[in-house]
Amino acid sequence: YTVLVQEIIDQLAETKYPTHVFVPGGVGGLAAAVAAHFHESLGKKRPKIIVVEPNSAACIFKSVQRDRIMKAEGNLDTFMACLSAGEVSPIAWPIIRSSVDHVIAIPDAAAIDAMKILAMPPFNDQSVNAGESGVAAIAGIISCDQKND
């Protein structure tokens, strides 16, 4: 995962680093790797890291709220199947705890809407065929925009 982040850093001029990065949650491995690499590479210039996960499997959200690893309770079924994690990875947790700025939980409908937008984009943009879990970050961005957060 860190190669992905390094490619982003290498391709962007220092004045064009992202201010915010939205990352799918799951058990937290991707989120931890992204957060850690931006932190190590950019220090205080690093972007805000926002983790996005499904409402029904919001283990990172609950863990951050309680400041300890928490299991997601109840039915973990979600349209975003690859993010249906019941518990944060104990390896990822210390990094998430110290380097993630925000965590948001979204409904399945947000992922469905994001898939539709990417498949049939406005303004004649190129379409993107993305899966249910892959659109979580985009759905998180749209969700924040709709709430004016």
Features from the language model and the residues they span:
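PLP-dependent amino-acid enzyme catalytic core
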Residues: 1-149
